């Protein structure tokens, strides 16, 4: 069976050296690659009732020409041909762009078959193909492949047809019969045939469902097997602490815990008291109380006789966290120390000696914590805040400071559940999805750029009451390519307008980290009242006095990033405001502004952002670790993702999966991916 799987594509008639080279560039090397090279779209020539067709979907209809065609020219070579078409009892508009010759083919009352994109709102079809006469039954659903250079779509169809005939029915099916039957999925051969040569929409739908599930299952199996291997290979620290002592500390806090904080805390302390190493992601919106949860977890480590570490991305954030922890542990005989690059000389030497002697219970700091000379006596808990801001190697180095300490990653970036279980699938995920009572909602408004004078008047009104403001711009300097505001121009403009009244600061990514810290210190101390910045303040410090956030060209940002920026205000007792300045051209841009104005819930926004931008853009283009699926879509197929995750967990935990022949193909996939070694899989 495997021989066919790895048979070279050169065995297919018509594939010579040049064609083989082109196919290799498309990632097609053997028969298996060829058969799993699925169409990127299907041209559906099957007649359908327009009532069933979704907006923007491609459709084929047969109808009578109901009006004389009208040809309109605009520009030198551009034109539009429009006519009315009676399809059953629907009277719709058909539009053809830049094909004036079609006018001669159309006559009032004649029957035509048209295919194109359906605009449900305008009851208009944008014609891509038009043929005189009734619909031809022999052409229903045609696959369209992504091709290049000397390989055409027709050639690709021919190559795949040969592969289906000669090899497909002898290839091993990755999905065991038991799983296929439980979800009523077709076998491998049937599914391949339906993907490449669908006879009906229903057959195609079923085949797609099978491959969606298969892709998700394989991915989740790798994740679950990785977790299993980690647990078996790394013996964690079983932390033993008194629940009564921990409850005494919790009751001493100046605020009651929310139900969500209590739930998350139970998950974390259960991990800490187990013999396995904790590897958990803690998600919580800005202001949801992650720091309090972190403090309680750190205290549990101290009660167990160990030390804890908290690593954050910036020096000023480290200082604020350290101050906050010192305040919380004031009456509890807990030693908190701060280590950043600013701690030098004798002070640094003394701190490191105390740390190695076990005299420091909690060490807070930046990447300075991972330097070689930093040694703990007994580190059992590592917490990193805004974990995606650190590289994998940095996180690994900190983890290696102890004997497999428990690790908790915290992020204020609300990550949709579908992405969290995919991108962070090897971790357990905890979510604080509830805000503390009494927290004021940030009022958010979407305005056009021509309202700048009114906005600045509103900003000044707030400044006169002793408040401060952030002004965010998408760029640092002027750009020829983008017509958007830049921070330097806005800084110069505001410095002129408010000269002698208010101090204006400037922060952007080109500043050295020391310079950024200095600017933020001045803003925190209210030495400057207006801070003009790029998105470098997205994850920043706590300035309770800042109550206004003005974002220029807000439609340039995704919802999640806008929400992170908005989270810089609303941290004190005063009412806060976020003003989105934007003149969006696209419907998606307008939709983003509307959603931002209506909701303050970060998780709801992150789900919407995922829908509008897609998974690839959610973390930014350069984000590594995002899996690429051929068929599956994490947003639209999230139910299948959940099912596959549960099935993968059950399989990996069962003896049958590692021994029974029916799971051999799935085990081979794990072996190929390098997640498990051959000994375990044999």
From Swiss-Prot:
Helicase ATP-binding domain mapped to chain residues: 271-432
Record's keyword annotation contains ATP-binding: yes
GO CC terms in record: cytoplasm; nucleoid
EC number per UniProt: 5.6.2.4
Disruption phenotype: Decreased viability with a cell proliferation defect and an increase in anucleate cells, very sensitive to DNA damaging agents 4-nitroquinoline-1-oxide, methylmethane sulfonate and mitomycin C. RecD2 is synthetically lethal with recG.
UniProt catalytic activity: Couples ATP hydrolysis with the unwinding of duplex DNA by translocating in the 3'-5' direction; ATP + H2O = ADP + phosphate + H(+)
Any one GO molecular function term: ATP binding
Keywords: ATP-binding, Cytoplasm, DNA damage, DNA recombination, DNA repair, DNA-binding, Helicase, Hydrolase, Isomerase, Nucleotide-binding
Motif residue range(s): DEAH box: 385-388
Domain of life, per lineage: Bacteria
Subunit structure of this chain's protein: Monomer. Interacts with SSB (sbbA), via the latter's 6 C-terminal residues. Colocalizes with DNA pol III subunit gamma/tau (dnaX).
Function: Critical role in recombination and DNA repair. Helps process Holliday junction intermediates to mature products by catalyzing branch migration. Has a DNA unwinding activity characteristic of a DNA helicase with 3'-5' polarity. Unwinds branched duplex DNA (Y-DNA), Holliday junction (HJ) DNA and partially replicated forks as well as catalyzing fork reversal/regression. Does not seem to unwind R-loops. Inhibits the diadenylate cyclase (DAC) activity of DisA in the presence but not absence of HJ DNA, possibly by relocating DisA from the junction.
Protein name: ATP-dependent DNA helicase RecG
């Amino acid at each position: 069976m495997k021989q066919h799987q790895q048979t070279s594509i050169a065995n297919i008639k018509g594939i010579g050296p040049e064609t083989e080279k082109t196919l290799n560039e498309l990632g097609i090397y053997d028969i298996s690659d060829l058969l799993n090279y699925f169409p990127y779209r299907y041209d559906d020539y099957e007649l359908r009732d327009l009532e069933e067709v979704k907006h923007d979907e491609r459709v084929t209809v047969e109808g009578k020409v109901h009006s004389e065609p009208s040809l309109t020219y605009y520009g030198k070579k551009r034109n539009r041909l429009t006519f009315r078409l009676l399809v059953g009892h629907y009277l719709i508009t058909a539009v053809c762009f830049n094909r004036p010759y079609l006018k001669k083919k159309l006559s009032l009352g004649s029957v035509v078959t048209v295919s194109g994109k359906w605009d449900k709102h305008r009851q208009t079809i944008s014609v891509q193909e038009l043929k005189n006469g009734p619909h031809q039954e022999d052409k229903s659903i045609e696959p369209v492949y992504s091709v290049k250079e000397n390989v055409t779509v027709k050639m690709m169809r021919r190559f795949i047809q040969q592969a289906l005939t000669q090899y497909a029915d002898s290839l091993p099916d990755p999905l065991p019969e038991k799983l296929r039957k439980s979800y009523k999925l077709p076998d491998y051969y049937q599914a391949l045939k339906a993907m490449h040569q669908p006879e009906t929409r229903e057959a195609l739908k079923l085949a797609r469902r099978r491959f969606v599930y298969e892709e998700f299952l394989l991915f989740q199996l790798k994740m679950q097997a990785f977790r299993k291997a980690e647990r078996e290979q790394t013996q964690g620290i079983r932390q033993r602490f008194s629940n009564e002592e921990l409850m005494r500390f919790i009751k001493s806090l100046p605020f009651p815990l929310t139900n969500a904080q209590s739930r998350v805390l139970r998950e974390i302390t259960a991990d800490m008291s187990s013999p396995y190493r904790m590897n958990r992601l803690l998600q919580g919106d800005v202001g949801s109380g992650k720091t309090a949860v972190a403090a309680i977890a750190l205290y549990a480590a101290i009660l167990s006789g160990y030390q804890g570490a908290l690593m954050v991305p910036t020096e000023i954030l480290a200082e604020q966290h350290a101050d906050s922890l010192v305040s919380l542990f004031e009456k509890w005989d807990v030693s908190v120390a701060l280590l950043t690059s600013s701690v030098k000389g004798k002070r640094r030497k003394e701190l490191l000696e105390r740390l190695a002697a076990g005299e420091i219970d909690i060490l807070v700091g930046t990447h300075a914590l991972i330097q070689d000379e930093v040694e703990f006596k007994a580190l059992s808990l590592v917490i990193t805040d805004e974990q995606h801001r650190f590289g994998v190697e940095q996180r690994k180095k900190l983890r290696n400071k102890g004997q497999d300490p428990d690790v908790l990653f915290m992020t204020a970036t609300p990550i949709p559940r579908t992405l969290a279980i995919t991108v962070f699938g090897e971790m357990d995920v905890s979510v604080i999805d509830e805000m503390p009572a009494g927290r004021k909602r940030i009022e958010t408004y979407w305005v056009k750029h021509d309202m700048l004078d009114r906005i600045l008047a509103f900003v000044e009104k707030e400044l006169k009451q002793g408040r401060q403001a952030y002004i965010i711009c998408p760029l640092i300097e002027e750009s020829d390519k983008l017509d958007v505001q830049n921070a330097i121009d806005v800084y110069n403009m505001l410095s002129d307008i408010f000269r002698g009244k208010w101090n204006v600061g400037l922060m952007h990514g080109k500043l050295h980290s020391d310079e950024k810290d200095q600017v933020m210190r001045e803003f925190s101390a209210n030495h400057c009242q207006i801070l003009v910045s790029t998105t470098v303040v997205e994850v920043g410090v706590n300035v309770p006095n800042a109550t206004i956030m003005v974002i220029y060209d807000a439609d340039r940002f995704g919802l999640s990033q806008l929400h992170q920026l908005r989270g810089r205000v609303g941290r004190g007792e005063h009412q806060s405001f976020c003003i989105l300045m934007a003149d969006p051209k696209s419907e998606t841009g307008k939709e983003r502004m509307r959603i931002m104005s209506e909701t303050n819930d970060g998780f709801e926004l992150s789900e919407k952002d995922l829908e509008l931008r897609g998974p690839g853009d959610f973390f930014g283009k350069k984000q590594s670790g995002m899996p690429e699926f051929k068929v599956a879509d994490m947003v639209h197929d999230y139910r299948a993702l959940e099912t596959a995750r549960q099935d993968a967990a059950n399989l990996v935990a069962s003896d049958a999966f590692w021994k029974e022949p029916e799971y051999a193909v799935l085990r081979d996939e794990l072996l190929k991916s390098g997640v498990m070694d051959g000994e375990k899989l044999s």
